[in-house]
């Protein structure tokens, strides 16, 4: 019998796994995909939000702000890409200024540092490529960008290094409470565990409804993105938002940690939990809205497009559900934006709650570091050549110029 089974190998599930690996517990993470980071965590905006948008007193505000504060140190421990580039929320007419003031006040109450409203020459000095129609912006200097798949993989690798086991291609089809804990029926057999932590994304409500007294309903919300060539990566330095609306934070323009520009997302609710196709209409909308912020955006340089799903709770809920709804069953439900930003804090919280429930003791030999990671794209050509001469796997695979992977990178 396991002590804990974590369901879901996205950013939150892997953050939970890494934090639980601090404890003397037998932990297994199960993921229905072939690897970690194959769902929402691989297809999102890659933003570490500052925390000014989340409603005061909400779980989104609490975990966003704490997660943002944890992220930089976590990136150093686990060696994944992180850059504090700041963010701007644009306002295109004077009538929108009260909304900016509201975001400023909300962020200050939430504990976000350094917020200010900028106008005129100050705004243009920050980002010269912005539309001349932008009259003001909320500036959030603590906003950042990460590599979401690099982050999720790093969390998983460190968890595995500290003893967590992983089972892929394993779909939990049914879960039920037992006297000893929980029985999980999967497509690859039955598992017994003392406790469960569900971080199942758009499938989280299905599991919740099998064991909890109330009913939850998740509506998958699809967002479409365009990725631009690296030659355009310097057009903006900061993440550029427009004023948020009822469907989310709207279409953004942001640099990526790899040097590209990213545009999106759209926001379309759908019944399917696995449909991530892009549409001509969706991509056109994202591009049109992005050009409202940055008119000179060279959309001829789009090199790929993609879509991802976020787990939006229906029935008017606008917050995360994080906790222990029934004894021994912990969950992170409805993790949409700012889920990636919140993942380190959610992971720490749920791990501490589960460890307390199981009366676990901390390990004396927990290793927080991920070492010896080679980032080839950041090395000078001579160093790459030396590595390839020492190990031909470093030079055996060549793909398109988006990210310059090699066979050795994949083996690592």
Label each PLM-derived region with a short phrase.
Residues 46-126, 135, 250-251, 391:
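Dinucleotide-binding Rossmann-like beta1-alpha1 core, especially the glycine-rich loop
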Residues 22-41:
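Glycine-rich FAD pyrophosphate-binding loop
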Residues 15, 175-180, 184-264, 268-277, ...:
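Flavin-dependent oxidoreductases
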Residues 142-194:
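Helical element adjacent to the flavin cofactor pocket in flavoenzyme catalytic cores
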Residues 2-28:
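N-terminal Rossmann-like FAD-binding beta1-loop-alpha1 element of flavoenzymes
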Residues 62-65, 93-99, 139-157, 276-281, ...:
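Short beta-strand to alpha-helix junction loop
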Residues 257-258, 274-382, 387-396:
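C-terminal catalytic lobe of FAD-dependent flavoproteins
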Residues 400-412:
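Single conserved hydrophobic/aromatic residue that forms the stacking wall/gate
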């Amino acid at each position: 019998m396991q002590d804990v089974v974590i369901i879901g190998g996205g950013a939150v599930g892997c953050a939970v796994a890494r934090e639980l690996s601090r404890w003397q517990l037998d932990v297994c993470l199960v993921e229905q995909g072939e690897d970690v980071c194959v769902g929402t965590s691989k297809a999102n905006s890659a933003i570490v939000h500052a925390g000014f948008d989340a409603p005061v007193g909400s779980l989104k505000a609490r975990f966003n702000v704490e997660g943002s504060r944890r992220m930089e140190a976590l990136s150093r421990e686990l060696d994944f890409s992180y850059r504090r580039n700041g963010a701007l929320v644009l306002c295109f007419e004077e009538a929108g200024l009260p909304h900016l003031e509201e975001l400023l006040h909300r962020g200050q109450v939430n504990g976000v540092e350094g917020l200010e409203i900028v106008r005129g020459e100050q705004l243009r000095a920050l980002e010269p490529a912005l539309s001349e129609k932008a009259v003001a912006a909320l500036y959030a200097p603590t906003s950042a960008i990460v590599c979401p798949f690099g982050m999720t993989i790093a969390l998983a690798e460190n968890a595995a290094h500290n003893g967590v086991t992983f089972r892929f291609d394993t779909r939990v089809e049914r879960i039920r409470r037992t006297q000893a804990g929980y029985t999980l029926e999967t497509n690859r057999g039955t598992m017994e565990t003392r406790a469960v932590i569900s971080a199942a994304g758009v499938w989280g409500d299905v599991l919740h409804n099998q064991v909890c007294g109330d009913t939850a309903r998740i509506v998958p919300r699809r967002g479409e993105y365009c990725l631009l060539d690296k030659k355009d990566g310097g057009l903006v330095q900061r993440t550029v938002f427009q004023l948020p609306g009822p469907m989310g934070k709207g279409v953004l323009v942001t640099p990526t940690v790899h040097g590209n520009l990213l545009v999106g997302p759209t926001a379309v609710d759908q019944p399917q939990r696995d449909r991530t196709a892009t549409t001509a209409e969706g991509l056109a909308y994202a591009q049109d809205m992005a050009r409202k912020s940055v008119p000179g955006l060279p959309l001829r340089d789009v090199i790929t497009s993609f879509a991802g799903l976020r787990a939006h709770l229906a029935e008017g809920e606008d917050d995360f559900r994080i906790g222990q709804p029934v004894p021994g069953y912990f969950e992170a439900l409805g993790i949409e934006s700012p889920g990636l930003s919140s993942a380190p804090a959610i992971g720490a919280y749920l791990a501490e709650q589960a460890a307390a429930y199981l009366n676990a003791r901390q390990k004396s030999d927990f290793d927080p570091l991920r070492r010896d990671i080679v980032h080839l794209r950041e090395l000078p050509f001579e160093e790459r050549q030396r590595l390839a001469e020492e190990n031909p796997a470093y030079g055996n695979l060549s793909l398109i110029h988006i990210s310059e992977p090699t066979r050795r990178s994949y083996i690592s």
